[in-house]
């Protein structure tokens, strides 16, 4: 089975430039391969089998970044096409934008090219990066890949994917059951009559967020003050997101320990958020994310 651990990393100025360069090259190769596939199919009515290696002669600066990051960009594109062919409702693969809120790249652990220590992380074609590791990684976990990302707030993170042995859990008859139903106020209601008591973090921060966004609208676009204020707005959103995730992690963990089986109603949350003026409330609840956490 696979386990993921997300950690905060603190790259210096040179390392930040290298990370941004790798993210940019991964985005470029994804978009270029997608454009060439579309163009080739329009002419030949066949799928083009292109690889990142075929672009390095024309674009030699691609050699400056981690080749595994480019290979993963190719895998992500192929995965997007498979999803589209399997389920057209997912939509045709789209170009990646430089202005996307969250930018990232993925590299794989091969032949000791990635080194993880208590306070440092060594990535391919990069010097050692300072990190903050909040938990001890078991010695029998094998590192598979690392995804480096930059959040809108400017913070950098590394998501470490490990391969570990399946944990055998003794099966026993379910005795303690709980039913959960969606609720606009408090996120959900339990069959015991209790409510989850979700504090509605977005609603509480709405006035402050509106004030910061109003300041942003008055700044000259792309100026230094604009970038500073944009970061403040991103930090507000990040705090709300972290508060929501912390609450849901703790609640899902508590329910998983107290009950043997939990039954939930199958709802079209996307449809609910799109109609009846419920969008803001449904998205603030994060009910879908809570069910996902409860599942694992």
What are these regions (language model features)?
Residues 1-70:
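Gly/serine-rich nucleotide phosphate-binding loop at the start of the catalytic core
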Residues 3-6, 139-142, 152-296:
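Positively charged, helix-rich recognition surfaces that bind polyanionic ligands
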Residues 7-9, 129-135, 196-198:
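Generic detection of short hydrophobic beta-strand segments and adjacent strand-loop junctions
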Residues 15, 26, 66-73, 244-251, ...:
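Hydrophobic (often cysteine-bearing) scaffold residues that line and stabilize catalytic clefts
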Residues 18-23, 85-88, 257, 263:
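Short amphipathic alpha-helical segments with coiled-coil-like heptad repeat character
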Residues 26-37, 73-76, 80-81, 85, ...:
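Short, Φ-rich (hydrophobic/aromatic) sequence segments
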Residues 34, 38-41, 81, 85-92, ...:
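Long, hydrophobic, amphipathic alpha-helical segments used as structural scaffolds
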Residues 50-152:
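Acidic carboxylate diad motif detector
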């Amino acid at each position: 089975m696979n386990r993921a651990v997300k950690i905060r990393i603190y790259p210096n100025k040179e390392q930040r430039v290298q990370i941004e360069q790798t993210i940019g090259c991964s985005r470029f190769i994804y978009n270029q391969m997608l454009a060439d596939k579309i163009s080739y199919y329009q002419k030949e009515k066949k799928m083009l089998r292109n690889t990142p290696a075929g672009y390095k002669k024309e674009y030699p600066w691609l050699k400056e970044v981690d080749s595994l990051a480019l290979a993963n960009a190719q895998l992500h594109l192929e995965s997007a096409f498979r999803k589209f062919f399997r389920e057209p409702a997912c939509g045709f693969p789209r170009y990646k934008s430089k202005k996307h809120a969250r930018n990232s790249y993925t590299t794989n652990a091969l032949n000791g090219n990635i080194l993880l220590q208590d306070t440092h992380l060594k990535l391919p074609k990069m010097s050692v990066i300072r990190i903050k590791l909040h938990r001890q990684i078991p010695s029998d976990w094998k590192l598979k890949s690392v995804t480096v990302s930059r959040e809108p707030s400017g913070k950098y993170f590394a998501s470490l994917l490990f391969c570990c042995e399946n944990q055998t859990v003794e099966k026993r008859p379910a005795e303690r059951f709980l039913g959960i139903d969606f609720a606009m106020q408090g996120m959900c209601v339990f069959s015991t009559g209790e409510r989850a008591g979700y504090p509605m973090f977005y609603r509480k921060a709405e006035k402050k967020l509106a004030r910061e966004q109003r300041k942003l609208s008055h700044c000259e676009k792309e100026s230094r003050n604009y970038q500073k204020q944009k970061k403040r707005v991103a930090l507000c959103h990040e705090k709300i997101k972290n508060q929501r995730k912390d609450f849901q992690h703790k609640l899902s963990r508590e329910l998983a320990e107290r009950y043997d089986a939990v039954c939930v109603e199958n709802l079209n949350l996307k449809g609910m958020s799109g109609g009846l003026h419920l969008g803001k409330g449904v998205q603030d609840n994060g009910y879908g994310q809570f069910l996902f956490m409860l599942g694992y």
